UniProtKB/Swiss-Prot annotation:
SUPFAM superfamilies in the record: Translation proteins
Pfam family, one: Ribosomal_L3
Single GO term (MF): rRNA binding
Cited function: One of the primary rRNA binding proteins, it binds directly near the 3'-end of the 23S rRNA, where it nucleates assembly of the 50S subunit.
Top-rank taxon: Bacteria
Name by which UniProt lists this protein: Large ribosomal subunit protein uL3
């Protein structure tokens, strides 16, 4: 599975050949460095670990510092693994850039969604709420959360107030509209999870085949 780590820069509008406006999200993809290679014999699965973003050594834990020194690589702030059938074609220290994708490819994008803090049921679960008429005290309340004698408990998964957002969210089958390799920019059709400057993980779509198979597949 081809993939790369990037940073969400924001949204803008581009135009296709026929003049149609397309809302796109701009992602700075890479450059990423192959920090570690995992194989089936030693680790039980095949994958590569990519590093993205510079960081000072004083901000790292000792096991991380040891990993970077052993590989003789510059420390990276963000590390993510990408599983694949065979990782033998990659070497530690190899650099991956935005051009691993091409315009027309479909990708899956994963990132932490925006945190909304403590939210009620109307905002968190899209409940209708109660009547807003004169004399009503129900308004934005959740209402009943279960019966009395049976089941005499709250059903698992019942929508209730609580912390909203800041969860790992994946949107599938987003189309790559444009690639700018010189600037390491990928323009993705539509919106993606996370706030501006959020770290995102881009992988080839698992439910759609891209036009051209990449060597990482």
């Amino acid at each position: 599975m081809v993939g790369i780590i990037g940073k969400k820069l924001g949204m803008t509008t581009v135009f296709d050949e026929t003049g149609n406006a397309i809302a796109v999200t701009v992602v700075e993809a890479g450059p990423c460095t192959v920090m570690q290679i995992r194989d089936n014999e030693k680790d039980g699965y095949s994958a590569i670990q990519l590093g993205y973003g510079a960081v000072k050594e004083k901000h790292l834990k000792k096991p991380q510092i040891g990993q970077f020194k052993k590989a003789n690589l510059e420390p990276k702030k963000y590390l993510k693994e990408f599983r694949m059938d065979d990782a033998s074609s990659y070497t530690v220290g190899q650099e991956l850039k935005a051009d691993i994708f091409q315009a027309g490819d479909f990708i899956d994008v994963s990132s932490l969604s925006k945190g909304r803090g403590f939210a009620g049921v109307m905002k968190r679960h899209n409940y209708d709420g109660g009547p807003m008429s004169h004399g009503s005290n129900f308004r934005r309340r959740a209402g009943s959360i279960g019966c009395n004698s049976y089941p005499a408990r709250v059903w698992k998964g019942k929508g209730m107030p609580g912390h909203m957002g800041n969860t790992l969210t994946t949107i599938q089958n987003l189309k790559v509209v444009e690639i700018r390799p010189d600037d390491n920019l990928i323009m993705i059709k539509g919106a993606i999870p996370g706030a501006i400057n959020s770290i995102v993980k881009l992988t080839s779509a698992v439910k759609k085949r891209n036009k051209k198979k990449n060597s990482m597949n």
